[in-house]
Design a protein with these regions (language model features):
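C-terminal motif of bacterial Sec signal peptides marking the signal peptidase cleavage site
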Residues: 19-22
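Bacterial N-terminal signal peptides that target proteins for export
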Residues: 2-11
Length: 391
């Protein structure tokens, strides 16, 4: 008697048929796999504890509001026509008011800047003074003729066309627009110094007491976050304010860096939430590199980018606004950090580069193009970036 089997001949044939195509396909035929890797959702910066958000970004938002109020109410229009208006500007900067916090106490507060804070505060005081003098309020007197005159080499005044035009701006005797310098200086001395110098510091992620309090969890009184979480969140909040000033439609050299930075912040926060501190440290170092390159790229774009060079070729003074912005971003580079935590450029190195652009008649000088190129090459080398595409 034959042994019993549960596999009938037709079933065996069907099984072999199913296997055969994998072994006998036409030469050159492409076989598409039906396997698809699981989709990994993009990271989000949304974290909760017991149904309540554990992310508090209020302080960075207040700092940005104070800075923007100073710029829009006083600096952009440079309409400081009397002592009352001048005192109002200085008081708002130093003490706050009108529902705005003071900006001055936030400037260069990290331990890395303690040596230079006095000099940096002096730079900001000079910018405010330059704004009033550029618009005709010199000494204790305001002169309408100074406010309404066109700027020229060695003479303050406006560049642009009619009064009230958005493109009209005021410059000092060397052609620099202090209002545009101010925005880049704030980017560095407040947003970058807070994010990179104060809060994104290895000492927080390696501190045993902070780790233990975080894992307990021991929450900050009155809030739903731990001290370690809030430290990272504050860095993220100041980055968001910096990112607004770094955005540019014409900046193509670092496409994707904004997404990489956001992902690094979000994944770093997630790593902290899950006690993966070494991974958080890795994201911290990536953020330092990416953010430094973003600031340097924006500086290069404003100093020697297409818009700047096109204006230099046609009507040079129209480029002064772009160059002034670029010098502001150049100033901010002293607050960037290498992956190791060391600065890319020192305070002295940055001031030296800026001084080279102010030599002679400043932006009015016939040698400006060559000096811009020299500064650009230096930044390109330091930050491993390509120079902007020329016309």
């Amino acid at each position: 008697m034959k042994p019993y089997t549960s596999i009938r001949p037709w079933a065996l044939l069907l099984a072999l048929t199913a296997i055969t195509p994998a072994c006998s396909r036409w030469e050159g035929e492409v076989v598409e796999s039906q396997y698809q890797a699981p989709l990994v959702p993009d990271p989000t910066y949304t974290f909760q504890r017991q149904g309540t958000s554990s992310v508090d970004l209020l302080l960075p938002q207040q700092a940005a509001s104070a800075s923007e109020t100073l710029y829009s109410r006083f600096l952009r229009t440079a309409y400081i026509l009397n002592a009352t208006r001048w005192q109002e500007l200085k008081q708002l900067f130093a003490q706050g008011g009108n529902n705005e916090i003071a900006l001055e106490p936030l400037i260069a507060t990290s331990a890395q800047q303690s040596k230079y804070r006095t000099a940096i505060l002096s730079d900001f005081a000079q910018i405010l003074d330059d704004v009033r003098r550029a618009a005709g309020y010199d000494g204790d007197t305001y002169a309408t003729e100074r406010y309404n005159r066109r700027a020229s080499a060695g003479q303050t005044g406006f560049i642009g066309y009619n009064q009230g035009d958005n493109d009209r701006f005021f410059v000092t005797t060397d052609g620099f627009a202090p209002s545009e310098l101010y925005r880049g200086m704030t980017l560095g001395a407040v947003y970058l110094d807070k994010a990179l110098g104060e809060y994104l510091d290895e000492k927080f992620l390696t501190d045993k007491a902070l780790r233990q309090a975080h894992e307990a969890p021991q929450l900050v009184p009155g809030h739903s976050y731990t001290a370690l979480e809030h430290t990272w969140d504050l860095a993220y909040g100041y980055y968001l304010q910096a990112q607004k000033l770094l955005q540019s439609n014409s900046l193509t050299g670092l496409r994707g860096s904004e997404t990489k930075l956001f992902n690094a912040f979000a994944l770093g926060r997630l790593a902290i939430t899950e006690y993966r501190y070494e991974e958080a440290l890795s994201h911290l170092r990536s953020i330092r590199t990416l953010l430094a390159q973003a600031v340097a790229a924006r500086a290069l774009e404003e100093l020697v980018g297409r818009n700047t060079l096109a204006n230099l070729n046609e009507r040079p003074e129209d480029a002064f606004r772009f160059i002034s912005r670029g010098v502001g971003y150049l100033y901010a580079l002293q607050f960037t950090r290498r992956p190791s935590g060391e600065p890319y450029l020192s305070h002295e190195e940055v001031k030296s580069l800026i001084a080279s652009l102010k030599a002679g008649e400043g932006l009015w000088d016939s040698s400006l193009r060559g000096r811009l190129d020299k500064v650009a090459r230096s930044l390109s080398s330091t930050f491993a970036l390509s120079l902007p595409t020329r016309l």
